[in-house]
Curated annotation (Swiss-Prot):
Organism: Vibrio cholerae serotype O1 (strain ATCC 39315 / El Tor Inaba N16961)
Entry-linked Pfam families: PNP_phzG_C, PNPOx_N
Keywords attached to this entry: Flavoprotein, FMN, Oxidoreductase, Pyridoxine biosynthesis
Lineage: Bacteria, Pseudomonadati, Pseudomonadota, Gammaproteobacteria, Vibrionales
Catalytic reactions on record: pyridoxamine 5'-phosphate + O2 + H2O = pyridoxal 5'-phosphate + H2O2 + NH4(+); pyridoxine 5'-phosphate + O2 = pyridoxal 5'-phosphate + H2O2
Gene: pdxH
Subunit description: Homodimer.
Protein name: Pyridoxine/pyridoxamine 5'-phosphate oxidase
Molecular function GO terms recorded: FMN binding; pyridoxamine phosphate oxidase activity
Matches recorded under InterPro entries: Pyridox_Oxase, Pyridox_Oxase_CS, Pyridox_Oxase_N, Pyridoxamine_oxidase_dimer_C, Split_barrel_FMN-bd
Record EC number: 1.4.3.5
Length: 211
């Protein structure tokens, strides 16, 4: 399939250094809020890239659940493939694509596990159905049929019908402490604007990159 004729112009305007926030987390929050305000589908969806012990990269879509100066937080099954990769190599890449705004953000950083208290606080805030699903699914393991998963879900739903659901030991979150953040804004004639924030000790440097 030849896709060479699929192209479009970027029309939403550029990004200038004078428009940037000094702190990249502030810049990220500004863009994220604009994506939310624009009613984009799944504005908190991000690609999480990890590498296995053989150097093979893997990607998957995960939802961002918190962001602050400490980093970017997501939750997962601690026995999942991504968790196994992180245990081997905790360097991670995140990518947020906000296509309608002609923007994307690329983040590199180091993953660290959240505390048991942080895990419990978020787990208890989830809908009960989501809590049950977290226990029913041993993520990335092989199953013979969908019915096996659905049967386990219904079994647990009945078991916890009238009680509190405990946080499973194999479920938790990670915080990605950022080392770099790149902000990309589409530009006319493919002259896109790219700014890279790089951590230098407790400060950030900002460089413009060629598109």
């Amino acid at each position: 399939m030849d896709l060479s004729d699929i192209r479009r112009e970027y029309i939403h305007g550029g990004l200038r250094r004078k428009d940037l926030q000094a702190n990249p987390i502030d810049q990220f929050n500004l863009w994220l809020q604009q994506a939310i305000d624009a009613n984009l589908s799944d504005p908190t969806a991000m690609t999480v890239a990890t590498v296995d012990e053989h150097g093979q990269p893997f990607q998957r879509i995960v939802l961002l659940k918190n962001v602050d100066d400490a980093g970017f937080v997501f939750y997962t099954n601690l026995g999942s493939r991504k968790a196994q990769h992180i245990a081997h190599n905790n360097k991670i890449s995140l990518h947020f694509p906000w296509h309608p705004l002609e923007r994307q953000v690329h983040i590199t950083g180091v993953a660290e596990k959240l505390t048991a208290m942080e895990n419990m606080k978020y787990f208890m805030s989830r809908p009960k159905e989501s809590q049950i699903a977290a226990i029913a699914s041993h993520q990335s393991s092989r199953i013979s049929a969908r019915g096996v998963l659905e049967g386990k879900y219904l079994e647990l739903k009945q078991k916890f019908a009238n009680g509190e659901i405990p946080v499973p030991s194999f479920w938790g979150g990670y915080r990605i402490r950022p080392e770099s953040l790149e902000f990309w804004q589409g530009g006319e004639h493919r002259l896109h604007d790219r700014f890279l924030y790089s951590r230098q000790d407790d400060n950030w440097t900002v460089d413009r990159l060629a598109p």
